[in-house]
Amino acid sequence: MVDYGGTVIVALSGGADSVCLLHNLVLLKDKYNLKVMACHLNHHLRGEESNSDMEFCKELCRQNNIELFVKEVDVDKLSNELKISHEECGRNCRYEFFNFLAEKYNAKIATAHNSDDNLETTIYNMTRGASLKGLSGIPKVRDYIIRPLINTSREKIEEYCKGYGLKYVTDSTNLTDEYTRNKIRHNVIPVLKEINPSVENTVLQMNSTLSEIAEYIEKSGQLLLKIAQSGEGYLTNKLKDANIVVLKEAIAILEDAIDVNEI
């Protein structure tokens, strides 16, 4: 995930997951000659609690001699201006921040997504009628983003923190059913775990299989376009007999590459 001597910036919320991740990397940084830093985005959605979490992260990094980058955004105001949800706005702000830091410091950004997060995301995407890619789960690596804890359960992470005596904060909004993901976490997943106590691992295996299928279809779509290409266009006689799934993928690839309004 990170090359020897590389730079990694931990997305630090102050919760158990990111505290565990930072602690792991601090323990490993000398062995692998890593430059470890951290970043924190204050969404200002929880009043004083948001500020308290930010100060917690500052103190944690000070104690571990870790450089911390902090950005503050009024997500409520911005989401209203853009007419999008708090969740979408917050995510956009986070990844904009990550992209800036990754480019500036030639760094990998380590997020603390775990196997429970992956399960929640997969279920959420199912309810939205997601494609194969959407059902492939949260990738362990995507561009500059790495997720070292994606195969580790939230329970194991909390046990780790307890074992090392690590303090962390709890986001009060995670305790309510205000957000869709929380409804899934509190109401759907407990039932699934009654049916299959290892459901996180089962879904991870499913994600892996679907990811391989999605990759095969994507490569097949790319090959079809290569075969059918003629100058700046494509020969319909080369496309019409193609497998419908591969043809749909080829069209999706074109839509991603070309402004559909100009076709």
Positions of PLM-derived features:
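Contiguous mid-protein beta-loop-alpha structural module that forms a pocket-lining wall or clamp
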Residues: 146-236, 251
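Core alpha/beta nucleotide-donor-binding catalytic domains of modification enzymes
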Residues: 1-187
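Short coil/turn residues that cap or connect secondary-structure elements
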Residues: 49, 130, 195, 243-246, ...
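Active-site catalytic microenvironments for nucleophilic, acid-base chemistry
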Residues: 24-31, 191-194, 254-257
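AMP-forming adenylation/ATP pyrophosphatase catalytic core
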Residues: 1-17, 37, 41, 73, ...
